[in-house]
A protein has these predicted regions:
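Helix-turn-helix DNA-binding elements, focusing on the entry/boundary residues of the two helices
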Residues: 17, 28, 46
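Residues in the recognition helix of alpha-helical DNA-binding motifs
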Residues: 9, 23, 34, 63
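DNA major-groove recognition helix of helix-turn-helix/homeodomain DNA-binding modules
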Residues: 44-59
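Short alpha-helical "recognition helix" segments of helix-turn-helix
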Residues: 19-22, 49
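Short amphipathic recognition helices of helix-turn-helix/homeodomain-type DNA-binding modules
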Residues: 59-65
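Recognition helix of helix-turn-helix/homeodomain-like DNA-binding domains
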Residues: 26-41
Length: 65
């Protein structure tokens, strides 16, 4: 995951890590593990994040692939 691309989008929507974690139904510790590069988002979470921020397919690819 490219957090350098996702973070500005989150901030533009007024979200911090804990806000996004809650919005997608993930615990903060699990979110932090992924955020810090020790895991990856499952497809269901990628879909929820993409919907929340109205990400284009290109943005999804650049952030998560």
């Amino acid at each position: 995951m490219n957090k350098e691309l996702l973070e500005p989008i989150m901030r533009a929507h007024g979200d911090k890590n804990k806000d996004l974690a809650a919005a997608i139904g993930m615990s903060v510790p699990n979110f932090s593990t992924i955020w810090n590069g020790r895991g990856e988002f499952a497809l269901k979470y990628i879909r929820l994040i993409a919907r929340r921020y109205s990400l284009t397919p290109e943005q999804v690819y650049k952030i998560f692939i």
